[in-house]
């Protein structure tokens, strides 16, 4: 909870992330554009890099604890684990994106600056601090080697990752629309697995999303942790949820 609390409780979220990275001894750069700033931690830069991202900005009027100090905390824990390794050879950019809540501006600027031809795939960590289930929108990427083992079936099974076929849009969609394979990961309560799976099935079979589906979606507890909802407060969140996702990503990057 420490990282999540420092980010969610700060009036300078970007500055808090920079302070944490500096304290752990990570090398990072701040991408400064006219309309957004990103923070990038690069390991072994190449033209076949995997991007693991989380947006650092918050919805106006929200403290942005679950959306998305939790995802930023996941990235910080994984970076910390990699720094503790004597050797890490995979090419990975950990990117803290700005202005996701304004249409994924930070993700768009990052792709423009790096070049989509130099990005192999993208993992988006968004809303990772509530519930006891890991949900991953795989977008037909199970077993895709571009994800450096993170999408291996054995790893997904080991960490009990659920594949509902649908999660709400985030920065992953900016990469997907650019032709870059992408997945999104979050945590949620058990009922969310059912609701997201039902919506995912309808999308994949070209069935309409009904008003009843929308009501079921908006009634989920995890949805209420976002955008000024009933549970949009860090007191409702769990460090254990963040750890689940961080452990899955760390295991995939270091041990697969």
Positions of predicted regions on the chain:
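Glycine-rich beta-alpha junction loops
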Residues: 126-129, 188-192
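N-terminal capping segment at the start of a domain
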Residues: 1-12, 18, 57, 219-235
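Short secondary-structure junctions
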Residues: 23-31, 155-164
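A non-catalytic alpha/beta surface segment that caps or lines the substrate-entry region
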Residues: 1-44
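Structural recognition of the beta-strand scaffold that forms the well-ordered cores
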Residues: 40-42, 51-53, 93-96, 120-125, ...
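Glycine/charged-rich beta-loop-alpha catalytic/anionic-binding loops adjacent to active sites
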Residues: 47-48, 53-61
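Acidic/histidine-rich catalytic neighborhood of metal-dependent amide-processing enzymes
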Residues: 59-150, 158-168, 172-174
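His/Asp/Glu-rich mid-to-C-terminal helical/loop segments that flank catalytic regions of hydrolases
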Residues: 194-256
């Amino acid at each position: 909870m420490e990282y999540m609390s420092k980010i969610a409780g700060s009036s300078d979220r970007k500055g808090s992330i920079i302070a944490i990275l500096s304290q752990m001894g990570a090398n990072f750069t701040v991408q400064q554009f006219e309309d957004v700033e990103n923070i990038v931690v690069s390991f072994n830069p190449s033209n076949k890099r995997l991007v693991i991202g989380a947006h650092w900005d918050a919805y106006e009027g929200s403290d942005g604890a679950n959306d998305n100090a939790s995802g930023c905390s996941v990235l910080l824990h994984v970076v910390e684990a990699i720094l503790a390794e004597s050797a890490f050879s995979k090419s990975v950019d950990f990117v803290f994106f700005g202005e996701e809540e304004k249409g994924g501006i930070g993700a768009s600027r990052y792709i423009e600056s790096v070049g989509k031809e130099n990005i192999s795939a993208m993992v988006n960590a968004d809303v990772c601090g509530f519930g006891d289930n890991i949900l991953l929108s795989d977008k037909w990427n199970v077993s895709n080697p571009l994800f450096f083992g993170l999408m291996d079936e054995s790893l997904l099974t080991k960490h009990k990752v659920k594949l509902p076929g649908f999660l709400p849009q985030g920065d992953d969609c900016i990469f997907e629309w650019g032709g870059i394979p992408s997945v999104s990961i979050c945590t949620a309560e058990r009922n969310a697995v059912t609701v997201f799976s039902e919506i995912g099935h309808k999308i994949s079979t070209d069935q309409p999303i009904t008003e009843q589906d929308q009501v079921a979606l908006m009634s989920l507890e995890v949805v209420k942790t976002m955008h000024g909802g009933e549970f949009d407060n860090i007191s409702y969140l769990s460090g254990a949820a963040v750890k689940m996702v961080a452990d899955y990503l760390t295991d995939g990057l270091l041990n697969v």
